[in-house]
Amino acid sequence: MRRLRSLAYACLLTAGTASQERPSDDQVLTEIASTASCAECRTVLFSLKALARFGDQAVVNALTTGCIRAGAEDEDVCKGIIAQEGPIVARTVRNIAIPSRASDLLCTVLLAQCDVPKVRPHRIKFPKPKPNITRPAPSGQKPTIFVHFSDVHVDLDYEVGSSANCSKPICCRSFTPSDAPGNNSYPAGPYGNHNCDSPKTLEQSFYNAMERFAPDAKFALFTGDVPEHHVWLVNQSSVTRSIEDTYQEMSSTLRMPVYGTLGNHEAAPVNSYPFKGVVDPISSQWVYDVVSNAWSKWIGKESRTADEYGAYSYKVPNTNLRIISLNTNLFYKFNLWVYEADMQYDPNRQFKWLVDELQSAEDARERVYIMGHMPPGVNDALHDGSNHLDQIVNRYDATIAAMFWGHTHKESFELSYSNHSDLSHETASMVSYISPSLTPTSGSPAFRVLTVDPVTFGILDVTTYSAPLEHPKYQQGPMWSKYASAKETYGQLVGLTDPSSELTPAFWHNVTEAFESDDDAFQAYFARKSRGWDNSTCTGDCKKDEICQIRAAEAQYNCQVPNRRFPSDKSTRKIGLRHDGDECSSSGLAAILQSISSKAAQRQLRQAKQEL
């Protein structure tokens, strides 16, 4: 029966929309709920395309009705998210063909259906051929340090005593009378909770800890995501307030300069970064203006490029180091503006700009750190964009010292390779360091202090500092302490313990080989991703896929596939059960549509069990 339905849907897709009647809200809900194949997802897009002919509001109304009826989220969450993202979906489905590359990619995002299309062949053009040079050896001079932190997600309206176990996607506000202080069984403490974003008290403690443990830091890299996760409530005003308040807090507390980047949550609607030339009332210019103004204290006139498209290149004073901050939202799969009839190879010409900056750095014999929000190898990265960046990184691997990202909320690393069919210590070409988060939704709050060679800017060690929420005195004030040193932890696995030796790409590849043969070492690494909060084990396919992800700074090789018809249950938000993290890795609307589909699958499973 499923096969016959899929064939019928495929035939329907070829009929076009010219004579298509307006689909009813019930029809749209039924199609979303029953989607279990790529063909059926295309049918959903086909119906949305037909609805979009009657205006954006027709799409908004149908999706909102479906969300509420299915119980995918509370009514206010359904209305808030879909009112913001629904018009973008309407515009997208109006402008793309179904089926097409763009529509199938959209299906992987909205309903976790369809296989990700293969990367389109496209060679990046470089001004000069790659010279015969390699990474410089450590200078042996006295090391220096800097700080890397990410995903602060400060909730300016966090309410002490409000419920930390609410019905919303994120808690610790008085959404209902039963959530108010004194009316609930899980009151939020003054310094945060795993089901909530960061209160101001935690943010202030965080910056003070950086000053305490890294008083001589030359600078800090902040890899983005300032606003809280209440995506159904955000607007330009609230996001602007959040960005300005957080960067002001950094400026007033930290003596070190902070070099920032744009996260997906810095936009309103969330994830929404239209490209240049898009004729639409929704524009990214306001957020580029806000962040460039916030960054100007530390990067001065270089903030002008940030004002244009959220990226900049900055030479750190009195050093040979250039920091290049990328806007990874331009190849982020939950940015619904990327799905065009003719999907761009280089949105806003950012990759062309990056090549020019790296060529200038190579010519001047500068060292470079590349930073951005989303790691290019994760499942959230569009494969084409990730491939283009990987080409650039491998061309300039002797100039780039390391790369830095956030977004996942978990402490990890990724490796780039010059030959993806021969992964070895000899072909490992670049290391990406992925920072843990301040927000405690995926583990204990944490930041990293990196020890570096002052000439080559190669990474000599990475030390993580954290404040476990499970400490009995945590709510009296976070107890910050050293959590782990990369060289102390992993150096002994591969025979590299010399403090002056660099943690090269070859070193990190050898660590992944040690993970394969030493399961205790791997399980300890897996636990450290959440700073010890998630005590589950990762074996079999989980372990294989985790190591595959580490070795895949280019996303097409990360071994991940869409999670089709996965279970979704609000009960998993209860205290102690919300371990998955990666809250940044989902569009609010996509999560709603997938919840509708998975809830229907759960009902079918329960019914089948009853019939047995």
Describe these PLM feature segments:
Residues 1-20:
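Fungal secretory targeting signals
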Residues 20-140, 144-158, 162-211, 219, ...:
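Metal-dependent phosphoesterase/phosphodiesterase active-site architecture
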Residues 148-150, 190, 218-225, 257-264, ...:
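Active-site neighborhood of phospho(di)ester-bond hydrolases with catalytic His/Asp-centered motifs
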Residues 156, 228-231, 260-271, 332-334, ...:
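Active-site environment of divalent metal-dependent phosphoester hydrolases
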Residues 188-190, 195-280, 284-287:
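Core catalytic region of metal-dependent phosphoesterases/phosphodiesterases
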Residues 222-230, 358-378:
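Short acidic, glycine-rich surface-loop motifs adjacent to enzyme active sites
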Residues 238-247, 347-354, 384-389:
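Well-ordered, non-membrane alpha-helical segments in soluble/globular domains
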Residues 357, 362, 386-394:
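Active-site neighborhood of glycoside hydrolase catalytic domains
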